[in-house]
């Protein structure tokens, strides 16, 4: 106290000894507080003024302006310079709005200041706040009343106080701002505290002193803690020592000293280092001596406050920014609860330079509204106070007094490698001061101190709950979770401790001491167990009920609520809340599920659970429940949602099972629906396909037709059905495929031979009506089984029967439709058989009979041909199945076709039936009856059927064969249909009617839907159109016939047609064929002569179709040529002649063949008159067959 002026000492002694000074000090303190509030209120305004119009500092103060300007400019937004002053009002308002927050922060600081000053005043160590004496000199306590001249030099203290002293603006000794403080210990003498600057509107912030030197090692000397401190005022009785830091009004006596300006004589000397105003702005520079003492105390208070605030602030900021090194210098936690001079515990906060710098930065960030006057003292006191603390620390070295400190330091050093959460808990205990009673947390400020309740709560929150309780309890929770840390078990949880702060503080102290006594094992446990424990904590989080199935989580979900564990209570509460929500949700979804509604959210959620849950089951063990063994674990809701009712779980599981079944099989089922539809449609076609065999060849005739027929003999029924689908909707038999043996190929070959120019697509597109009929025309599909179809002949025959069953309507009456197509078919058959059609028996393409009478005839024919077909099927392995499309759209399989009768049936048997108009339906009936009676002699019928089918098939294949053959066939079919419709009509009438029917019915056939009911009508119209077209276009037929054999007579051609019919229908016994040849030999010769002599002439002796195969083919070719020419020249005449001749031929055949062979007779008769048109379509086919 030698350096203190006398008035200050006197004032200090009087203030310390006079208890009555308490009210006065309190008033002064309150005045200071309000002055600070006003200053903060006006400071933003001044700062904005300074930003808008910054004054040019004098050279003397330029450096000081530098720092302050930096601070102020940082507050000023960019671009504020030169802004209109009219907008300053807004800034002022904003500053005013910020003032309350600044005031609150000020109150906070002041309250902390009082809380820190309390222990000093209680212990009577008022003078201990002063800094230590120069090194090597032990300060002595001056007696009460001691005085010194105020002008006494302060040489001994000046060089030491340089870091703290700040030059008075009015002093004549400019300070070197760049000077650095000396490395020795530093003292905060009164002179350093007296250098306070007067408040200025634009308070300049001195640049903070450089980084403090290494003053923190323990000083070698132990100065008297009372040295260099002003004596307590007279009459002042220090309060008894207390273990509490509670501040009472008496504690504020020494703080609320009047603050006046400091005399200039007390300013530091020139050699003082760079410093900062201690409490600039708090008072004027001209003040009484008493103000100096107050300033001294205030500065000392700031020093202590800085240390304490740093501790508290570091405790709050340790999570993110504070370095563990800072806590190495905070061994306060080792102090016991015994009473000690506060100065002996406070200096123990010995931050390193780095830690001190961090603390300063944190203080700046934590108190942004503080004026530079407050920031600089806190910075400087943070540097200077440790100097005085070091003196006191020297009195009691920590190594001697507290041998356990090195262990704690080591433990804290090891905290660098600890997880963040563990570091936080460690930091809490390292920063906490258990020597302070628990009341400090609840009552930081005196009860009568004017602090708002909100600020009070904030102080308690930051200094108490967050700084000490919560973190300590976090560590306790971690230790409780750790298997080996049973010490922390049984201790209150954070929430319970927050309610009872005292107990939690004591427990925190206990835990801290335990860590201090044995830090290494716990540290090892923390290091080894924390990550696992943290992962367990994450798994046990209630929000992961669905995903976490570990033993820990299950135990946490099922363990009873601990009465002494707040965390368990919260966890249980959260779990109950989640369970309630899930129960409500599941109840709602259960109702929806029962109603048949499956919410999308439930689906997705369970899908996600199914994906995540089995994965956890692979590596997680469940203690209470067996782990699911398959991906069906998601269904096992008992594991995941054990809190649900059993009924709800069962329903949910059943729902999940159904959902997964739908999810897995829904798409296949949706795909199977159309497949089933196809299967239903293929019922009839399936048998045909089977009959057709696995041959991969497709009937080119069918392909040539507008209807795309894919023979899927080797493919599955579904694929075959798909391929069988007709491209044109007009075609009504996408499913009906006519299994054709090589005969089909032969038919195709024949049209191939026919020039494509003559063929307008499959069937020459006749008129518009005819074009529409073309698609409907090729109603019969021939599946080229080639000779391979021969395999499974019996099966094919049976399949043919099945096909018949599938097709409700019987096979097309071969005697009728086949007659129309017979000539072409027989010609084609001849053409095919000439090169060896026996093996490649032409599968008779069953032509669709338009007339129900034709259907009946076809039924009869089929029934008649079946025996012969079966016989020949046995003889020949080739399978030729003829699918007859009935008017109803149903297809009938002609077993004779499957048997490839054509191969076995001699061509002589294949008699061309008059495809022209069968005038007399009676004749047809007779033929059918004859067929019925002569089942064994139905070879001619079969050939007729084959011929008809083949004629249709050649016509049906849209290839050249069809077009060429169709031209004559059209005429023939027209005549035939007319004959069927009006069998009694004369040839002329029939021809006209046929044309009319063609013009009228063929057009409706286009319009008619593909329904089976109108299918026959469409077929009729189609054939009529074809016939008419063929009549109109017989040239291609003629060309083909010329290509084949022009020397053959029409009779031979008719016999060839008969052969084709025989081949298509089935194998006809050779005896019948020989008989037919014998009977019709003369007639065939006559017909040949007739055909050869007049090209247009038509042999009436079609009754002799059973001529030698070769002769038949030749005659057929000649007849077809002649018929073609004749049809071209005079189609009407030819038709009439055909109509007449078929009648005659039918009659003759009936007479000759009797009832046994009505078909043969009919083909013969029909062939003779109708052979030209029939030969026309069939001539091309036959010729083409011959060529091929």
From Swiss-Prot:
Biased composition (Basic and acidic residues): 138-154, 960-976
Region: Disordered, residue numbers: 57-92, 121-249, 483-510, 530-567, 733-813, 934-1013, 1121-1143, 1155-1188
Biased composition range(s): Pro residues: 210-241
GO cellular component, one term: membrane
Any matching Pfam family: FAM75
Keyword set, alphabetical order: Differentiation, Membrane, Spermatogenesis, Transmembrane, Transmembrane helix
InterPro entries: SPATA31, SPATA31F3-like
Topological category with respect to the lipid bilayer: Single-pass membrane protein
GO biological process, one term: spermatogenesis
TM spans (from-to): 23-43
Cellular location(s): Membrane
Feature: compositional bias, Basic residues: 59-68, 80-92
Biased composition (Polar residues): 495-510, 783-800, 943-954, 1121-1130
Low complexity composition-biased segments: 191-207
Record family assignment: Belongs to the SPATA31 family.
Task of the protein: May play a role in spermatogenesis.
Protein name listed in UniProt: Spermatogenesis-associated protein 31C1
Organism: Homo sapiens
């Amino acid at each position: 106290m030698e350096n203190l002026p006398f008035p200050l000492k006197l004032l200090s002694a009087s203030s310390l000894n006079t208890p009555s000074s308490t009210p006065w000090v309190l008033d002064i303190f309150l005045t200071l507080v309000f002055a600070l509030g006003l200053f903060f209120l006006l400071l933003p305004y001044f700062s904005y003024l300074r930003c808008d119009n910054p004054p040019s500092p004098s050279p003397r103060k330029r450096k000081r302006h530098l720092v302050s300007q930096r601070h102020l400019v940082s507050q000023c937004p960019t671009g504020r310079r030169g802004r209109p002053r009219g907008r300053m009002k807004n800034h002022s308002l904003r500053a005013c709005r910020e003032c309350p927050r600044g005031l609150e922060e000020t109150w906070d600081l002041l309250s902390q200041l009082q809380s820190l000053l309390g222990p000093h005043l209680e212990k009577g160590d008022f003078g201990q706040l002063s800094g230590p004496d120069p090194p090597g000199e032990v300060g002595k306590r001056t007696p009460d009343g001691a005085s010194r001249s105020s002008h006494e030099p302060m040489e001994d203290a000046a060089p030491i106080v340089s870091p703290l002293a700040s030059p008075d603006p009015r002093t004549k000794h400019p300070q070197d701002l760049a000077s650095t403080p000396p490395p020795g210990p530093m003292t905060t003498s009164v002179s350093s505290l007296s250098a306070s600057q007067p408040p200025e509107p634009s308070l300049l912030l001195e640049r903070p002193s450089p980084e403090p030197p290494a003053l923190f090692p323990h000083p070698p000397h132990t100065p008297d803690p009372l040295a260099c401190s002003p004596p307590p005022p007279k009459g002042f009785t220090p309060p008894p020592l207390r273990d509490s830091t509670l501040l009472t009004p008496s504690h504020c006596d020494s703080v609320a000293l009047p603050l006046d300006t400091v005399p200039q004589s007390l300013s530091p000397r020139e050699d003082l280092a760079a410093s900062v105003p201690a409490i600039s702005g708090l008072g004027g520079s001209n003040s009484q001596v008493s103000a100096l003492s107050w300033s001294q105390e205030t500065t000392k208070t700031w020093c202590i406050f800085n240390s304490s605030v740093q501790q508290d602030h570091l405790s709050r900021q340790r999570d993110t920014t504070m370095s563990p090194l800072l806590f190495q210098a905070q061994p306060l936690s080792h102090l016991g609860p015994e009473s000690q001079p506060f100065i002996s515990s406070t200096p123990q906060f010995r931050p390193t330079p780095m830690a001190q710098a961090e603390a300063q930065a944190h203080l700046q960030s934590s108190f942004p509204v503080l004026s530079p006057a407050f920031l600089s003292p806190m910075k400087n006191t943070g540097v200077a106070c440790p100097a005085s603390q070091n003196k006191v620390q020297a009195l009691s070295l920590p190594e001697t007094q507290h041998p356990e400190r090195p262990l704690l330091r080591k433990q804290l050093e090891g905290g660098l490698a600890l997880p963040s959460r563990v570091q936080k808990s460690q930091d809490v205990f390292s920063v906490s001061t258990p020597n302070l009673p628990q009341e400090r947390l609840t009552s930081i400020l005196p009860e009568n101190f004017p602090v708002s309740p909100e600020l009070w709560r904030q102080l308690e929150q930051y200094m108490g709950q967050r700084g000490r309780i919560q973190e300590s309890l976090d560590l306790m929770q971690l230790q409780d979770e750790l298997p080996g840390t049973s010490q922390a078990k049984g201790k209150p949880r954070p929430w319970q401790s927050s309610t009872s702060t005292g107990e939690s503080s004591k427990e925190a102290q206990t835990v801290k001491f335990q860590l201090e006594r044995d830090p290494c094992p716990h540290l090892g446990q923390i290091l080894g167990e924390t990550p696992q424990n943290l992962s367990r904590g994450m798994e046990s989080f209630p929000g992961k009920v669905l995903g976490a199935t570990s033993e820990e989580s299950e135990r946490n979900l099922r363990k009873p609520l601990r009465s002494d564990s707040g965390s368990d209570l919260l966890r249980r509460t959260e779990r109950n809340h989640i369970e309630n929500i899930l129960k409500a949700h599941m109840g709602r979804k259960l109702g929806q599920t029962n109603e048949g509604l499956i919410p999308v959210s439930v689906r997705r959620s369970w899908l996600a659970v199914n994906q995540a849950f089995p994965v956890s089951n692979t590596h997680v063990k469940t203690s209470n429940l067996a782990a699911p063994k398959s991906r069906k674990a998601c269904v096992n809701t008992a594991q995941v949602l054990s809190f649900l009712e059993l009924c709800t779980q069962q329903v949910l599981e059943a729902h999940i099972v159904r959902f997964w079944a739908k999810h897995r099989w829904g798409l296949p089922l949706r795909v199977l629906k159309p497949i089933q539809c196809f299967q239903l449609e293929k019922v009839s076609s399936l048998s045909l396909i089977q009959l057709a065999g696995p041959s991969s060849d497709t009937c080119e005739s069918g392909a040539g037709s507008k209807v795309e027929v894919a023979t899927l003999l080797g493919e599955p029924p579904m694929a075959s059905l798909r391929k069988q689908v007709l491209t044109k909707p007009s075609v009504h038999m996408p499913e009906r495929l006519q299994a054709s043996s090589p005969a089909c190929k032969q038919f195709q070959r024949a049209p191939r031979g026919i020039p494509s120019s003559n063929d307008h697509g499959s069937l020459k597109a006749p008129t518009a009506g005819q074009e529409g009929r073309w698609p409907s025309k090729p109603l019969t599909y021939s599946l080229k089984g080639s000779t391979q179809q021969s395999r499974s002949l019996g099966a094919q025959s049976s399949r043919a029967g099945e096909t018949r069953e599938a097709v409700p309507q019987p096979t097309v009456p071969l005697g009728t439709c086949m007659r129309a197509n017979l000539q072409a078919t027989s010609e084609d058959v001849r053409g095919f058989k000439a090169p060896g059609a026996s093996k490649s028996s032409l599968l008779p393409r069953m032509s669709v009979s338009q007339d129900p009478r034709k259907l009946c005839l076809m039924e009869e024919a089929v029934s008649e041909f079946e025996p012969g077909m079966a016989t020949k099927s046995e003889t020949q392995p080739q399978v030729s199945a003829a699918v007859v499309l009935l008017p109803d759209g149903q297809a009938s399989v002609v077993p004779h076709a499957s048997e490839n009768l054509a191969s076995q049936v001699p061509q002589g048997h294949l008699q061309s039936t008059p495809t022209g108009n069968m005038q007399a339906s009676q004749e047809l009936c007779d033929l059918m009856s004859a067929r019925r009676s002569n089942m064994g002699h139905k070879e001619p019928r079969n050939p007729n059927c084959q011929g008809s089918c083949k004629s249709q098939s050649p016509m049906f294949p849209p290839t050249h064969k069809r077009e060429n053959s169709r031209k004559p066939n059209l005429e023939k079919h027209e005549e035939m249909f007319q004959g069927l419709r009006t069998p009694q009509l004369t040839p002329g009438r029939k021809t006209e009617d046929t044309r009319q029917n063609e013009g009228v019915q063929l057009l409706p056939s286009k319009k008619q839907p593909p329904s089976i009911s109108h299918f026959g009508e469409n077929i009729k119209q189609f054939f009529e159109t074809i016939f008419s077209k063929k009549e109109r276009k017989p040239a291609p037929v003629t060309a083909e016939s010329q290509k084949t054999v022009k020397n053959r007579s029409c009779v031979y051609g008719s016999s060839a047609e008969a052969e084709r019919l025989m081949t298509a229908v089935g194998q006809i016994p050779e005896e019948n064929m020989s008989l037919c040849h014998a009977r019709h030999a003369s007639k065939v010769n006559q017909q040949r002569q007739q055909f050869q002599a007049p090209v247009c002439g038509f042999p009436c002796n079609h009754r002799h179709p059973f001529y030698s195969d070769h002769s038949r083919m030749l005659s057929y070719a000649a007849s077809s040529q002649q018929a073609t020419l004749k049809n071209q020249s005079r189609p009407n005449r030819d038709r009439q002649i055909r109509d007449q001749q078929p009648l005659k031929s039918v009659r003759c055949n009936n007479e000759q063949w009797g009832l046994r062979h009505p078909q043969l007779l009919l083909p013969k008769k029909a062939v003779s008159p109708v052979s030209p048109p029939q030969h026309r379509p069939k001539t091309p086919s036959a010729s083409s067959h011959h060529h091929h």
